[in-house]
Structures are given as C-alpha cells and as structure tokens.
Amino acid sequence: MLTPKGSAADTLPSAAEILATVRLQQTQQKIDLQGQLRQDALVVPFRLTQNGPVIRYSFTNPPETLQLRLGDTDSRLEELSQSDVEKITPAQFDRKVHGTSVTYEDLAFKFLYWPNARVVGEEPVRSRRCWKLELQAPSRESQYSNVVLWVDRQSGALMETEGYDWRGRLAKRFEVISVQKIEGQWFLKQMRIEELQPGTGKVQSRTYLEINK
C-alpha cells in the first residue's frame, strides 16, 4: 500500500515509488486460470499461470506459449517451444497476439521500468482513488512515445493505461472493467483494450481480455 511521505496529507509519492509498488503487486500472484481474448467474433482461449514474477500465457489454436519474467530492473518476454526459449526482441513488439489488438509489447510491461516518469496528480477511475503518472519512452524501440497510467492508491493495481504514438496521438487504451475475488485475493475479471485511429480518437478495434475462476 502506498503511503504519502511527509506531514502533509496531499504530499505525492515519487513516480519511482509508485512504479515499484505496481511491479511488486504484479509479482505477488500464484495462479492457474483459464481466460480468453475476445474481439468481435474472434475468441482466443488461453491458460494463464503465474508463479511470482513468472507469468505464462498458453494458447492452443495455433499453439503458442509466451512467458513474461518481471525482474528488478527490466522485464523479459519469451516464446517457449518444446526445445527452445526465444526472447521477444523490440523488432517484434508490434506483432499482434493471435489477431487481436494486443501486441507483444503490451504483454511485456516494459513501461513499468521506464526511468523518465512523473506523477501528475490524483484522478478517480471507477470510483477508485488513483495516482496518475506520465512516462516517457527511453528509446524508439517502443511503439509508444509516452504512456499514461492510473494506479490504484490502495492496492497498486493498474486501473487504466493509455499509449501514445510518436506523434503524440492516443493510439491505445487499456481499462479494467471488472475484478473478482479468487482464493481471497482480488484479480482481474475483464479488461477492455481499444485501438484508436490516430488523430481522430475513433475506435478501430476493441478486444476484451477475460479471466475465469
């Protein structure tokens, strides 16, 4: 739980402190669940397993296993096969996951480690008090120049994320729609991912990431 420093109640924690809390929150799960990516008529089932900082997405049609390792200073997204482990490189970041709006970079959580970040203030998201952060990409390896985060003050959970292209236009939005309690812990139930037309803000595609108990 984030606790503002200092005597003043409205003193903001640093962006580094908030991001450290988000990373910690992301690595505290131990789960084995079923989920799906749903975009219009397309439904892509997957198995989601996590053991601390290692998160695995296992798809069956076609077969693909993606593994995310959340480290202290960086994350690593890998593609697993029966005989090999291949690191996902920045050149593959814009590759879409099974034809949905979700890309490899979106699964990699690289932005949680970007050093150029600042706290803008506090804004509510779905009645939750959230810190609002602006992050700047350290290089053009990312498809996003800037990312804006809304982080739940109490839990450190990501409630909403916006990614902007290299012309400063909103390109993608991730929003937690609902959560659920699994074995005494709150966990994502549904997230909406919207890919937007640059410059107009019109939604080009909408994908839902849904997790079942």
Residue spans for each PLM region:
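Short, exposed beta-strand/loop patches in secreted or surface proteins that constitute
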Residues: 45-50, 67-70, 117-122, 177-179
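N-terminal cleavable signal peptides for secretion/export
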Residues: 2-52
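Gly/Pro-enriched, hydrophobic low-complexity segments
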Residues: 129-213
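Short, surface-exposed beta-strand/loop "edge" segments at domain boundaries and coil↔beta transitions
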Residues: 40-44, 62-69, 81-88, 141-144, ...
